[in-house]
């Protein structure tokens, strides 16, 4: 509740996000959501005159969407992930984009939209490949095979 009451520096925003990450690692997903939701709202409202990439929005939105997906709030996760995807593209900030695409692929899979899921898995796979993220390449290959029987090469 108190997250939106002040003005924060970039480091303080990262610190609040890291607090949410502690809850994530402890598998306390609802506690993480309780931090990430007001933090994202704060970033969207208080820092609206700062470019979203500078305001840490893609990073916070990625974590928030991932947590929403974990607690099976797929519609909400898609809404947040699509918002983050758009910011990444509009502002040329691609650090979180491959992970955001993977979240979208997973959510659409769980909603039964195989076609959209396959398209997004391919997009995420190639971005992971471009940036040589071997760990996430292995994860996405396994996941696409398990969920969709999809071979990514």
At which residue positions do the language-model features occur?
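Amphipathic alpha-helical segments of tetratricopeptide repeats
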Residues: 1-4, 37-48, 82-89, 123-133
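Short coil/turn linker motifs that delimit alpha-helical repeat modules in TPR/alpha-solenoid proteins
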Residues: 7-8, 52-53, 92-93, 113, ...
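Residue register of alpha-helical TPR repeats
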Residues: 14, 52-59, 99, 119, ...
